Amino acid sequence: MPLEIVTVPCLSDNYAYLIHDADAGKTALVDAPEAAPIQSELDRRGWSLDQVWLTHHHWDHVDGLAALRDRYKPTVIGAEADAHRLPPLDLAVSEGDRFDLGGAPVEVLDVSGHTVGHIAFHLPTGKAVFTADSLMALGCGRLFEGTPDQMWASLSKLAALPDDTLVCSGHEYTQSNARFALSVDPDNAALKTRAAEIDQARAEGRPTVPSLLSLEKSTNPFLRAADPGIQSLLGMQGADPARVFAEIRARKDHF
């Protein structure tokens, strides 16, 4: 039976994710913005909580962990590089490490940029990657700690995953990201179609995530810094993609 992935809205615009392996009867949580909606979803489905995967240290991704830990006693997994500023970890992991959720392997990717020590969790058999505030729907996280070179390397790593991978990001920023993307790439037909679909989804109260990696690669300007068309629109033909990415990120910061 395939893994079940459930998007859980938290706080004002955060998302947590529950991953359930029905064959093994095991459930993991990606990030813990607040406990109440996560507990409610677990109760509604009759699931316990076996693992919590933390992507980075920001409060809006960890604030609900203490209550969840008290109730469920899960194994808490996070980045070894971030262990000094994360809640106490039961398992500290780094780039290239693997662990299992029931029968499903989980691969750890270093995606530093938004923070130094940010990690993503890739489920190759579940065809999903949990990116939090690194790669986002039509965007990427602001560079609070890392450099443009680091974030471009992280995004390039994520873009190399299979096209049918679901990108499970950490916030509902997609409408504003779409407006910015159209300012950078106004003639992209796929982007215009996607922006209209996003507006419709939000009007109906539906999440715009997860998104498909193939769609991100064709519409997300932060993944397209090496694209000659984007470079031409920015007046940066032939420039190093990391420099082009830095320019796109700077424009977004002031958009």
UniProtKB/Swiss-Prot annotation:
It holds the Pfam family HAGH_C. It comes from the Bacteria. Zn(2+) 2 binds at D60, H61, D133, H171. It catalyses: an S-(2-hydroxyacyl)glutathione + H2O = a 2-hydroxy carboxylate + glutathione + H(+). Its EC number is 3.1.2.6. InterPro entries: Clx_II_MBL (IPR035680), Glyoxalase_II_hydrolase (IPR050110), HAGH_C (IPR032282), Hydroxyacylglutathione_Hdrlase (IPR017782), Metallo-B-lactamas (IPR001279), RibonucZ/Hydroxyglut_hydro (IPR036866). One of its GO terms (biological process) is methylglyoxal catabolic process to D-lactate via S-lactoyl-glutathione. Keywords: Hydrolase, Metal-binding, Zinc. Pathway: Secondary metabolite metabolism; methylglyoxal degradation; (R)-lactate from methylglyoxal: step 2/2. Binds 2 Zn(2+) ions per subunit. Zn(2+) 1 binds at H56, H58, H114, D133. Its cofactor is Zn(2+). It is an enzyme of class 3 (hydrolase). GO terms for molecular function: hydroxyacylglutathione hydrolase activity; metal ion binding. PANTHER family: HYDROXYACYLGLUTATHIONE HYDROLASE, HYDROXYACYLGLUTATHIONE HYDROLASE GLOB. Monomer. Thiolesterase that catalyzes the hydrolysis of S-D-lactoyl-glutathione to form glutathione and D-lactic acid. Belongs to the metallo-beta-lactamase superfamily. Glyoxalase II family. This is Hydroxyacylglutathione hydrolase. The lineage of its organism: Bacteria, Pseudomonadati, Pseudomonadota, Alphaproteobacteria, Rhodobacterales.
